[in-house]
From Swiss-Prot:
GO MF term set: growth factor activity
Disulphide linkage map: C103-C121
Biased composition (Acidic residues): 212-226
The protein's name: Fibroblast growth factor 23
Keyword Oxidoreductase set for record: no
Xref: SMART domains: FGF
Composition bias, Basic and acidic residues: 198-211, 227-245
Signal peptide: 1-23
PANTHER family documented for this protein: FIBROBLAST GROWTH FACTOR (PTHR11486)
Keyword set includes Glycoprotein: yes
Amino acid sequence: MDVNRRIGVKDALLALLLALLQGCPLGETAPNASPLVGSNWGNPRRYVHLQTSTDMSNFYLEIRLDGTVRKSTARTSYSVILLKADTRERIAILGVKSNRYLCMDLEGSPFSSPTCIRDDCLFNHSLLENNRDVYYSSRTGILFNLEGSRQVFVVGQNVPQTSLFLPRTNTVPLERLLLHRDKRNQVVDPSDPHRVAVGRAEEGSDSRALQEDDADLEVETEVEVGDDGRNASRERLQAPSDHDPWGVFSSNPGSPRSSGTVG
């Protein structure tokens, strides 16, 4: 009798435990309130253009090869951005083509760096009620603004129009972003260091690749001329390393800072 009673108690406890588990699944967690931790954020395939606007036009954040941070009226290779989550609400903003991070100094002036400096290159992110994103320095709280004005972000306070951003889907073909990287990482044959034989064998395909790259530069030059009426800069083409895309292991990079005029 006692044995049957014990078995009955165990069965009742087991049934109660199963009911509790069904009501509160072990895998259930608090809802994720931050879009930065979503499956698309921080994914290398999730390239975007950060768009802001004035009453007259739309603009896009550009991070150039020479480190210049500026705005562009058109989507170009240098306006392709990767938002990389550091925490639920803190991100790094990487220019994919230039392989440089957006940063901000203590005065709120933007610059870029080939390495992610924690104090300067991490931004807090907030999604406002109007479905616009703002990015502000994790150290000073100063809003990133493509017009260059400086304001500390305060919840509920009016935000400058050019500090409000919309992530737009990337429209630049990936081969235009990765062309120089692929060329730089080609293995050199010791018996043909100047790649004469390879050049003859691939003359047709190589010339097509160069034409695509020239077209890419031509579009961006037209944007520069349209902004200020003259060619603002001439840049030396260089490529990031596939083995260290975040610049973590870069040794002695010199001064990582490269200031840029926003405008």
